[in-house]
Amino acid sequence: RNSGIRKHSSTDEYNYFRGAAATVEVIPALQLSGFYSHRSIDGVIEGNEITSIYKTGLHRTEKEADKVNAFTLQLMGGNITYEKNNLKVGMTGIYYFFNRSYQPVLRTYAKYNLQGNYFHNVGVDYKYRWNRFTLTGEAAMGKQGYSLLNQLKYNILTGYQLLIVHRYYSHNYWAMFARSFGESSAPQNENGWYLATEASPLAHWKFFASLDLFSFPWWKYRISKPSQGVDGMFQSLYSPKRNLSMYVNYRYKRKERDVAGTDGKVILPTYQHRLRYRLTYSPDHLQLRTTVDYNHFHSQGQEGSQGYQFTQSCSYAFSFPIKISVQGTYFHTDDYDSRIYASEKGLLYTFYTPSFYGQGFRFSACVRYDVNKVFMFLVKFGQTIYEDRENIGSGNDLIQGNKKADLQMQLRIKI
């Protein structure tokens, strides 16, 4: 909606369209767009019905290969946008359907999720600027349910901002490819208020604080009743020089969760505290980054668990067209709930932030070679060594040993 029609530049093999699209300026300030897509999607077919959609794009085994191009999806739609001065208003409509009925096996918490053959969404979006205020929002309807998202941004002074966001996504709203602001990745079954502020009262300092109050009108995974939660964050950034910066980030989250072994009859609040310190130093062609994370998790009336990690990364861009990046991580957590995340540089157009639990080391190295303006070659190698287990994974992914290695290569050709 905000950026209009654009190419698909990610390695994601699911969230994209394949077809034709065009935008025409009907009159000054008025644009009309149309698009059509027809593509095959991986999945599982049982009794001439689609029972699940396979989104990874991996076809390593016979079972995974059987899911290739299991059904087709056709999609068509359009958008009309008017923009003049400080006002922007648009309307978008989309209609899509499968060649088979989509009937997934849904548990109680997911009983209102998308199912059927034919779907549609219609939405209206707006943006208005007035002095230091910016108001944006969207309202949409689907085959069932509706969703609302409104945001008010106030630039108080230079370096001072205030943001208020409200969202309401009904429990039965269906929008297959939609992504929106919220606690969940999909705009469904959520209501909440988000308040954030940013301030730079001192030279080289920047402070950020946010508070998110959310609720789920229907059940969620491992929450067998309507529930609510709180997510708060505070961050302090200090940057005394152009090539030197550091920040401290604290995050608190409270949610509800079923107690294991009670079949959802007992639900208690859980509390999570995350603390991160990061130092970045970038002299000339070198960049050094140090990250320390701490995570504490506990459920009411139960003993808590904790985890921490230490990560050091180093990257260097040589005068000739080679860039090298290495990173090492040591992690130690009590269980999965106290897991930690460590982001890594990866292939182009990918975002890689793996989680770790248990005890061990992670090492990765990435080399990029720009042959010329046309060819670019990139290779990445990583290895994780666990100190608390003798086997990794299960089934076809079982590794007999405590070491797990991965190798990725990419060749880009610009025409």
Predicted regions mapped to residue ranges:
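Hydrophobic, small-residue-rich alpha-helical packing segments that form membrane-like cores
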Residues: 18, 26, 32, 36-89, ...
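Long C-terminal interaction/binding lobes of large macromolecular proteins
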Residues: 1-4, 17, 21, 33-35, ...
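Exposed, low-structure sequence patches enriched in small/polar residues
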Residues: 15, 69-73, 78-104, 111-415
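A subset of solvent-exposed loop/turn segments in beta-rich extracellular surface proteins, enriched
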Residues: 1-11, 40-66, 111, 115-119, ...
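Short coil/turn connectors at secondary-structure junctions
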Residues: 29-30, 159
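Hydrophobic or amphipathic alpha-helical targeting/insertion segments
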Residues: 9, 14-17, 22-25
